[in-house]
């Protein structure tokens, strides 16, 4: 498509005829008596010089506008032609028609940028022409002004000289009249001796004759210069100034018409680009081609494809069948307690996948309380998963067991301490042959997320109260709760994921200190009060800010940061690595060597912060802001400078960058 439209021939002819006719009609205006009177007066030159200066100022101002406009338009075109390509890139066949149509509609910005490029070129040419016109007219005005001032000065100087000769001549005549009235016999002493009155009269008459001659000559000279200036030079200068004024004004009128024509062409070509006259699809037709129902149908239908049938069933929702334990069939009411106990210090809480996204840790389930009669036994047999993400240098030596899953029957829920010890050994990342006994793999349920906890039955009986949550080491809290992530962390993450992801300034805005302190004290009195974190209905923004402040308070109150202080030297080495890939692999290794409590708690928090980042457009929390807030809380201080906050911020940035590589996906 052509970038510019041709000038309409009729418009050009009409403009030309109008201009010629207008010139013929207006030519007689300068022949009117009132205008002739002004042009023939002494004020004509100064008046026309002033008028020409106004035209030059108009030309200069229009030139500045054109320069600013083409600079602005050029920058706009450059940014527009580059930026629209960075959004809604279509890759693959999974994109919806909405995304494809947005991509097509934004493509019109590139086409309009091409159309505007010719407009910018025209503006640049106009600016060059107006600049040359201004420079030329300024020089001509200066030349005419200097010439007129010089001629006026010559006439003025001649008249002034004639006036001085006249004054000298009149003064001598007055002296001669006085001398005639004096005594004839009186003498006058001079440097040359005494002179009689007669001698004085003779000398004075000679001076009068000379002064009279000079006076007459200067009068004739001044009159001659004045007549020449008035009859010849001034009309020529006036005509020249008048021509310059009309010339610059006519040139500016033409430039103004060119500006309007190019602007009209820009608008017309832009309209043709958006709504083509041929069969090409317009911007509106692309926008109307969106099929939301078809997009949703295609998205849902892909779950029927081969290899995705397992996604249709949530293993967490498979009901548990009630089966009485064989040992309970002998009618013995008072049975001795088991001869073994689960030892948390021997890693009785196995590593497994957890999920805190869109799941409340306090959703009650009747099947969980009815299936297991003993809360202690239930909490001692969590599901097993060994998928703790390995760094690249170790991944090849350890086999994955993330898919080993099966429903755990009541008969297999009790494991002896020797068996537990053997499982612990097989889960050791340093073990060269990490194998889990086949009979145990078949009896473990590895797909059940641990984010579902009970508000009343998750704690051992008799120890619900007076167990502090804040200021307690993560290992002690995990051992007490018999879970992988502290309940307060899961509950706070659940609330913010559900209600606060789109809330502006989440984690940046703090809640009332008294409210945070009061809720903290209630939870320290009784861990069951964690349920108080759930906001009331309807909730306010302050309720969500309170949860965010409580979560920050929990991590800040830990005796040791989630990334232990012992790793501060290694973290410093990591941050000094320049290569991004090597730096991420190094941090991956540090994360892999973390204890289970720190590993899984850090994993839950990091994935939650990434979900907050995904809603940056709504909550205005970018990566830098989150790292400034969480870095000093999660990472240890610089071993060489405890006041170096940037060390902790940079460590948090690397941690978020390596999260997908270092942690199991949710």
Swiss-Prot record:
Site, as annotated: Arginine finger: 508
UniProt KW Coiled coil keyword: yes
Pfam family, one: FCH
Compositionally skewed regions (Polar residues) per UniProt: 355-404
InterPro entries reported for this sequence: AH/BAR_dom_sf (IPR027267), F_BAR (IPR031160), FCH_dom (IPR001060), Rho-GAP (IPR050729), Rho_GTPase_activation_prot (IPR008936), RhoGAP_dom (IPR000198)
Boundaries of every Rho-GAP domain copy: 472-663
Gene Ontology biological process terms, A to Z: actin cytoskeleton organization; establishment of cell polarity; response to acidic pH; response to osmotic stress; septin ring organization; small GTPase-mediated signal transduction
Domain (F-BAR): residue spans on this chain: 33-295
Keywords: Coiled coil, Cytoplasm, GTPase activation, Phosphoprotein
In-chain residues carrying the UniProt-annotated modification Phosphothreonine: 386
Region (Disordered): 1-21, 325-439
Additional facts recorded: Present with 1500 molecules/cell in log phase SD medium. Lack of RGD1 diminishes the PKC pathway activity.
Protein name: RHO GTPase-activating protein RGD1
Top-level taxonomy: Eukaryota, Fungi, Dikarya, Ascomycota, Saccharomycotina
Gene name, Swiss-Prot/TrEMBL: RGD1
